[in-house]
Amino acid sequence: METVHVVAINPYRKGNKGKVFSYNIDTYDKVIESAAVKKMIQQIRGELPIDGVDLNDAQAVKKAQERLKSELPFFCPHYGMFKNNVRRQENAMPESFLFQTIIDVDDKEYVEKAIEKARELNCSSGIWNGSLLHLCYSARKKLHIGIRMPIGMTIEETQKAYCEALGVPYDESCITPERMIFLTDKDSEIYRSKMWCAVLPESEIQARRKAFLDRGLTVDGRGDAKVNSLQFTVNSLSLIHI
């Protein structure tokens, strides 16, 4: 059966930050492959000049680069659909939860080491085996690591555990259901699994939802858990065979 992908995305430059629309992966690809986005990324990184900005005025250049970054198209990695296309936490549709999250590496000096470490974790025998879904340079040439969440673990628990394994600081701003990520150009994409932004097989979705429900959470892992995540994950790894 062909894998279905769904992305909650605002594909427009200067798009309303409160609006996202559900498309398949083709729209995502058209955005990152566009000449316009490539030029914006080059300007943000200082590889191309910005029209009307004095290159000798460092403050003006920085301000213009920040403005351009804020104008980039963006997507939401945690959910494929938002009710009425409104990007708000309460509008994230539980049934569209993608069981994936994005780790931020904000230390430029650690980016290449983080790429190597992410690949190492992906091949390890622990809970991160097979977890790597996406590697991509951010607009500022830092790093976004897309990973599959271990069964039964919430976004917050996944972020904390993976950041510890990776050796980078945990950032609580990365765990909100409505989190948005600015898109970068195709050349910034280092690796993509075919399961990035994919709808999982129904049997796996049901097993993952049950894992959350058994912890006293919602089907998308929200709420106050009654069972420790590590204990539950260890006891539940046999539920899923990918």
Predicted regions and their residues:
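Short amphipathic alpha-helix segments
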Residues: 107-129
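A generic structural motif
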Residues: 141-148
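Long, compositionally biased, charged low-complexity segments
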Residues: 39-44, 60-69, 117-122, 204-216
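DNA replication initiation on ssDNA origins
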Residues: 1-99, 127
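Short beta-strand
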Residues: 133-140, 171-176
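DNA replication initiation modules
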Residues: 6-14, 82-109, 149-230, 235-239
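Short, well-ordered alpha-helical packing segments
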Residues: 115, 119, 146, 159-163
